[in-house]
Amino acid sequence: VALTTKFDPLFRRYQGRLPVAFLRALAQRESGMNPGSSSASPQAARGLMQITGVARTSYNEANGTSYTPDDMLDPEVSVRIGANLLGRIAGYYAKSAAPNMREDWSNPEFVKLLVAGWNAGYSQGGGVQRVASYLEQRGIPVTHDNVFKHAAAAGAVSYLQDPKRQAWQRSVADLFYAQPDWRDGAGAGILPLLLLGFMAWGAFRISR
């Protein structure tokens, strides 16, 4: 499936550990690659990555910025905030012991769970992490299907009980893996980066 690469320079600039193909697939599903996509409500999702008012406010508070709803129509701002949020979700998931919550772009379950956190909430309060903890306590594998199956029992938000959202999240993962470059550009993840840093520091000390 060939998608436009028009916004790839922005995706590369802000990708962090995220594959460009993933950001491309998400933008396609969110806005059809239309940076002008919006609605009348200031709190509604807007722009290329469909940044919500909640996500915009959270980013402003964390980074000392003052982006307005109209700023979300700037594709660079949209990608910057979107990639930042996705990176935070992946980092939050890394606290879990569940294998499918660990950053692994070759694992469709991780990708679907990441999209679920983006699309339906990721926190311990009522999002994916809450359901993941519930499943882990009961010895149930943390999978995308199981998160939706047990969301109500875990007391999660209604978004994680919506089959249409679940299907949409799957569609993002499917589109990601349909990209010929899906293996390219994914970050090494936290642990490998720490290991590389340690090795580099050791080599520096030995050479002194």
Feature-to-residue mapping (PLM):
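Non-catalytic cell-wall polysaccharide-engagement segments
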Residues: 1-16, 54-201, 206
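Secreted/periplasmic proteins that engage bacterial cell-wall peptidoglycan
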Residues: 17-46, 50-63
